[in-house]
């Protein structure tokens, strides 16, 4: 006998269509798309192209320095491949690009641009810094009193907007060069750069710091106690001293709170994608 094809429900069709737009696979969907003068595959591709274009535009907004240094055509090509490979299952594109650096680093064609991944990471950190929640920093007097009250080995909690990056390349110099390409060309292999980022008056501030200071700040961002954060710094520089390590945080008023170690949150709640 003849087998009747069972029509999928509306919700099933909607789910298939959504998956098709994200991953490009149209299995089980095309037979249920009415042609109406345009082939079903072409009709679906119109929607997919529109979604990809939106995602590429979002990536260009998130990674302007990468776009400038690669050139528009090259960037658009790789951003389109990333969007097609990665997709976004959400209408909220805020997190699109979180692994763009890793994607570019695995492309053999870009292997000679070894700095590209870290420049992506810097731009992603800039984005996360802007989007971070607001919080009030401690003034010097309150910070001093809080340190005394918190005991021997407190936890120093930083503002939510604080981010850090330790790179083997001159990524901050590259970023500045991308803003003013008429400046002297940058040698990305001239040495490592360790960077502190925060939000100041609604804009991203960036400062090059000693690698030990960034190790210290990164440990604090993960919820480490003060002594463990100093230990992390001393693994980079055996002569690191607490007073010097605190300078970037004090100069820029980046401390939100000081609590006894017994009050600290589990480390898993402090760890973020930006602080590996």
Regions found by a protein language model. Name each.
Residues 23-24, 181, 223:
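Short loop/turn hinge sites at secondary-structure boundaries
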Residues 25-30, 193-195, 249:
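Short acidic/polar alpha-helix capping motifs at helix-coil junctions
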Residues 4-135:
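N-terminal, charged low-complexity regulatory/assembly segments
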Residues 202-276:
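C-terminal structured interaction module
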Residues 84-211, 215, 274:
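Hydrophobic packing positions characteristic
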């Amino acid at each position: 006998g003849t087998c009747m094809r069972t029509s999928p429900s509306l919700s099933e069709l909607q789910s298939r269509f959504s998956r098709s737009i994200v991953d490009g696979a149209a299995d089980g969907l095309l037979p249920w798309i009415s042609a109406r003068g345009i082939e079903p595959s072409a009709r679906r591709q119109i929607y997919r192209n529109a979604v990809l274009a939106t995602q590429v535009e979002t990536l260009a907004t998130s990674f302007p320095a990468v776009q400038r240094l690669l050139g528009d055509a090259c960037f658009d090509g790789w951003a389109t491949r990333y969007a097609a490979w990665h997709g976004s299952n959400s209408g909220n594109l805020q997190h699109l690009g979180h692994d763009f650096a890793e994607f570019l680093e695995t492309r053999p064609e870009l292997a000679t641009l070894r700095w590209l991944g870290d420049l992506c990471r810097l731009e992603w950190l800039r984005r996360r810094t802007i989007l971070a929640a607001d919080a009030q920093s401690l003034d010097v007097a309150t910070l001093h009193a809080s340190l005394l009250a918190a005991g021997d080995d407190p936890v120093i909690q930083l503002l939510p907007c604080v981010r850090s990056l330790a790179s083997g390349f001159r990524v901050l110099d590259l970023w500045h060069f991308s803003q003013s390409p008429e400046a002297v060309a940058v040698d990305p292999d001239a040495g490592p750069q360790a960077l502190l980022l925060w939000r100041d008056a609604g804009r991203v501030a960036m400062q090059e710091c000693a690698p030990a200071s960034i190790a210290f700040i990164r440990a604090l961002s993960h919820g480490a106690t003060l002594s463990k954060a100093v230990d992390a710094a001393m693994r980079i520089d055996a002569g690191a001293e607490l007073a010097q390590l605190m300078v970037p945080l004090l100069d820029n008023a980046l401390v939100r709170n000081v609590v006894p170690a017994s009050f600290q949150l589990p480390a898993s709640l402090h760890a973020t994608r930006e602080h590996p």
